[in-house]
Amino acid sequence: MAGRTILLSAGGTGGHLFPAEALAHELRARGWSVHLATDKRATRFAGTFPADEIHAIDSATFGSRNPLALLKSGLSIWRGFKQSTALINRLKPAAVVGFGGYPTLPPLYAATRRQVPTLVHEQNAVMGRANKALAPRVTAIAGGFLPESDGPFASKTVLTGNPVRPAVIQASGTPYAPSSGRGVFRLLVFGGSQGAQYFSQVVPEAVRLLPATLRSRLRIVQQARPEDEGPVRSAYDELGVKAEVSPFFTDLASRIADAHLVISRSGASTVSEIAVIGRPAILVPYPYALDHDQAANATALERAGGAEIVPQEKLSAERLRGLLEVAMGAPDKLAAMAAAAKSVGRPDASRLLADVTEAIASGETVTEFKRRRSA
């Protein structure tokens, strides 16, 4: 399919692969042939990726300071660059799109050397290292939270938002229904593995400190690590609080839609899903996140009025008890927060990302694309 091929490149984690998969679906629906370049580890769980072909490209990280390890990493990336150049020469893609992670460096760098239009998508409000290295060279930057009007690359940045799952789009149709003064109050608590561990300690204790009249209103859904699941469930049972505790929820989107309040970490996907569905949140950024990207992501929602940020070191059980007590007594405030969160949601992120991809593939500049979009 000469001239109608797009090459996508994503690092070997779900966080990088998911937005690439969402774009692939959208591009294929528009008649494009889609290929994926990734590292060997990702090929194990990219079997359902909607690509005409998946290409394993050599790559490596520079996590070690050992000279031999650095040399080995450099050689792997050089091999990946040569492989990527050969792949681009064969496929002749109209554009190459990267989604972060070190495995994107060889294909994107090779594309810029071959003067193929290039785009990187950054999920977070702070650029990751691979995207930051590529930013000066690429044609365009699509951002989940990156501003279009500020920063060294603002002139070629388009705020597309982050693609979300179809289940999230479906859940976004559920309007927020505030809890009445004495009615059931549904609290959803979730996070990554470390997030679930911390919340497993502090949330049950905060609930214990609540007045009995408020505890009786609570219905809690909480993610917990397998080793914490039993103790967390027992803690709620002892308090007489109805709770559903599990290491994983396959229907998380509908759980968010059912919640009156969400307590969570603030990874890019989490913040994007909360915003699209439109629910008030207490966000606790993971304190050890690289480049503090979770804090920056949370700020985007807080600035809109849809969330309150509490650093982990300040989230004591007593502090959380106070936040819950205020929230349970302020249904109008929570409804306003839900509306504010939804106002910054981007349910059309996949479509916008495909629009930018097609624009650069046709030779259009970001400035021209923005002008056309605003006309």
From Swiss-Prot:
Molecular function in Gene Ontology: UDP-N-acetyl-D-glucosamine:N-acetylmuramoyl-L-alanyl-D-glutamyl-meso-2,6-diaminopimelyl-D-alanyl-D-alanine-diphosphoundecaprenol 4-beta-N-acetylglucosaminlytransferase activity; undecaprenyldiphospho-muramoylpentapeptide beta-N-acetylglucosaminyltransferase activity
One GO term of the biological process aspect: cell division
Keywords, comma-separated and alphabetical: Cell cycle, Cell division, Cell inner membrane, Cell membrane, Cell shape, Cell wall biogenesis/degradation, Glycosyltransferase, Membrane, Peptidoglycan synthesis, Transferase
Any one GO cellular component localisation term in the record: plasma membrane
Membrane topology of this protein: Peripheral membrane protein
Localization in the cell: Cell inner membrane
Reactions catalysed: di-trans,octa-cis-undecaprenyl diphospho-N-acetyl-alpha-D-muramoyl-L-alanyl-D-glutamyl-meso-2,6-diaminopimeloyl-D-alanyl-D-alanine + UDP-N-acetyl-alpha-D-glucosamine = di-trans,octa-cis-undecaprenyl diphospho-[N-acetyl-alpha-D-glucosaminyl-(1->4)]-N-acetyl-alpha-D-muramoyl-L-alanyl-D-glutamyl-meso-2,6-diaminopimeloyl-D-alanyl-D-alanine + UDP + H(+)
Superkingdom, natural source: Bacteria
Xref: Pfam families: Glyco_tran_28_C, Glyco_transf_28
Keyword Cell division: yes
Pathway where it operates: Cell wall biogenesis; peptidoglycan biosynthesis
Enzyme nomenclature, EC number: 2.4.1.227
Principal location class: membrane
Annotated binding of UDP-N-acetyl-alpha-D-glucosamine, by residue: 13-15, 124, 165, 193, 294
InterPro entries the record matches: GlcNAc_MurG, Glyco_trans_28_C, GlycoTrans_28_N
TM spans (from-to): none
Family: Belongs to the glycosyltransferase 28 family. MurG subfamily.
Protein's job: Cell wall formation. Catalyzes the transfer of a GlcNAc subunit on undecaprenyl-pyrophosphoryl-MurNAc-pentapeptide (lipid intermediate I) to form undecaprenyl-pyrophosphoryl-MurNAc-(pentapeptide)GlcNAc (lipid intermediate II).
Protein name per Swiss-Prot or TrEMBL: UDP-N-acetylglucosamine--N-acetylmuramyl-(pentapeptide) pyrophosphoryl-undecaprenol N-acetylglucosamine transferase
Gene name of the record: murG
